[in-house]
Structures are given as structure tokens and as C-alpha cells.
A protein has these predicted regions:
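Class I SAM-dependent methyltransferase SAM/SAH-binding core
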Residues: 45-99
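Short catalytic micro-motifs in class I SAM-dependent methyltransferases
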Residues: 114-115
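Short alpha-helix
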Residues: 169-184
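Conserved Class I S-adenosyl-L-methionine
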Residues: 188-255
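A short glycine-rich, Lys/Arg-flanked "PGG" loop and its adjoining helix->strand segment in the class I
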Residues: 123-138
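A conserved beta-strand element that flanks and buttresses the S-adenosyl-L-methionine
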Residues: 111
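Conserved class I S-adenosyl-L-methionine
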Residues: 1-39, 53-57, 74-77, 140-162, 201-203, ...
Length: 255
């Protein structure tokens, strides 16, 4: 993760993310739970845990869960939410995703939900996942993705970067699959969904100034018709509703 920018954004706005409905629970978490139904894991790791909502979910099917994040205030939120949820088997560790302080071939399950687009070295992160997973261990990726169309890809990522300086890239599904294959992680199940957002709360979470908020808002209002259609952009009352495409992937270490 882009450590300094991410720590500033998420550290300053940890409580806002802890109370964000799309981070607490959305379709992606429901899909993860369905993909993992019937499993029981000894050791699980949630990377980029944020306020710990995914870690809490997998704690119900895991003996031990490590919740990992580079930002201390977010880990404090994880502690609070895990106590509220009576999830006593969650411990927190502070590290960046590309450097995971865990021994090789020791983890049964890794989850990463809504965090991968902040990792500057996503390739290195996936390599780390492959290293620490046991053979036939499971990696779950749930993240907003970019369309394969170059125009849509550029518009989405530019907007995200203007709203959030810690944003690195919403990757195309083809990019993610290429990296997974490189490190012997085979996708056995995947589902596409949408992350539904409202402009005001989406921008306010990152603490941008009022003038810059207006600047970003105009880009939504003045977007080309094909962009509005692709991202379901529509004005309602004094807000703008839109959605990003999201992929949920279940991968198995094959060597």
C-alpha cells in the first residue's frame, strides 16, 4: 500500500470508514460468505482489513484470524468492532500488504476486500499470498475493478485518484488474472457485482475540500453519455448515484 498517503487518508478518516455502509456490508461480503460456506480454517489472514468487517466475518469459520493493515487508527477500529461482535479470535498486525510477516506455507485462507486498489505493488502482494498460503490454501479477492475499455478505465482511475490520493489503480480483470496465474493461484469461482455509491458520502469519507468536491462533481455531471451509462451515473435530489464494477474471486494455490 502507498503507506504515507494511505496512512494519512485512512488515519484521519478511520471512523468515517468504520461507519460506511458499503464497507460494513455489501454484496461483496455476502458473496464471500457464500463462497466459503461449509469451510473451517485453522489460520486466516485479512489483508487491508480497514475496520475489520471481513475479518469478523471469517472469524466465524476460522480458529485464528490475523487482521492486517498499515494504518494504526484503522486497527484500533478493528479492535473496537471485533469486541462489539464478540470475535475474540482476532488479532491485529500492522504491515503493508507487500511485506507480510508470516512464515511460508502456514496460512489456510487469505481475504482482501476493497483494499487491493491501494496496493502500489499488487504483483508483489500476490506473490506474498502465494508464499504464505499452504498448498490448496484459498485466496479471496473482492475489489472494485476497471472495465477493459481504455477510455472507461482512464476516466474511473483518474476520478478515484482525484478523490483519494492513496488510490493506486482499479485493475482490469484481465490484469488480475494474469498476475494470479503467474503465481500459481487458480481461480475456481468468481462473480461480478456492483458497488453502489452516493457521491456526497463517497467524497466526504476522504475529507476533500468543498471547492475540490465541486470540481469532482462537475466531472460526473459533464461525463460523456457512454461513461454515465457504464457507471450508472444519475443525479437525484442534491446527490449523484453511481456504481463501480466489482469482482469477487476465489482462488486456490495449485503448487
Amino acid at each position: 500500500m502507498n503507506k504515507s498517503k494511505a496512512q494519512q487518508i485512512f488515519g484521519d478518516n478511520a471512523e468515517a470508514y468504520a461507519n460506511s455502509p458499503v464497507h460494513v456490508r455489501d454484496d461483496s461480503l455476502d458473496i464471500i460468505e457464500k463462497m466459503l460456506a461449509g469451510y473451517n480454517f485453522e489460520m486466516a489472514l485479512d489483508v487491508g482489513t480497514g475496520a475489520g468487517f471481513t475479518a469478523i466475518s471469517i472469524s466465524n469459520i476460522s480458529h485464528t484470524v490475523l487482521a492486517s493493515d498499515p494504518t494504526r487508527p484503522m486497527l484500533e477500529q478493528t479492535r473496537k468492532t471485533s469486541i462489539s461482535a464478540n470475535s475474540a479470535n482476532i488479532s491485529v498486525i500492522q504491515n503493508i500488504a507487500e511485506q507480510i510477516p508470516i512464515s511460508t506455507n502456514t496460512v489456510d485462507l487469505i481475504t482482501c476486500r476493497k483494499a487491493g486498489h491501494h496496493f502500489p505493488e499488487f504483483d508483489k502482494y500476490i506473490h506474498e499470498c502465494s508464499r504464505i498460503l499452504k498448498q490448496k490454501g484459498i485466496l479471496i479477492i473482492a475489489d472494485s475493478i476497471s472495465p477493459e475499455n481504455e477510455d472507461l478505465d482512464q476516466w474511473l482511475n483518474q476520478i478515484e485518484l482525484e478523490r483519494d490520493p492513496s488510490h493506486v489503480r482499479n485493475r482490469k480483470l484481465s490484469e488480475i488474472n494474469m498476475i494470479l496465474n503467474k503465481y500459481h493461484l487458480r481461480t475456481v469461482e468468481h462473480q461480478l457485482t456492483r458497488i453502489h455509491l452516493s457521491f456526497n458520502s463517497w467524497v466526504d469519507r476522504t475529507g476533500v475540500s468543498k471547492s475540490y468536491k465541486n470540481h469532482i462533481q462537475q466531472k460526473f455531471i459533464n461525463a460523456e453519455p457512454h461513461i454515465k451509462e457504464a457507471f450508472q451515473i444519475r443525479s437525484i435530489d442534491k446527490d449523484i448515484l453511481f456504481s463501480w464494477p466489482c469482482a469477487v474471486m476465489k482462488c486456490v494455490k495449485s503448487v
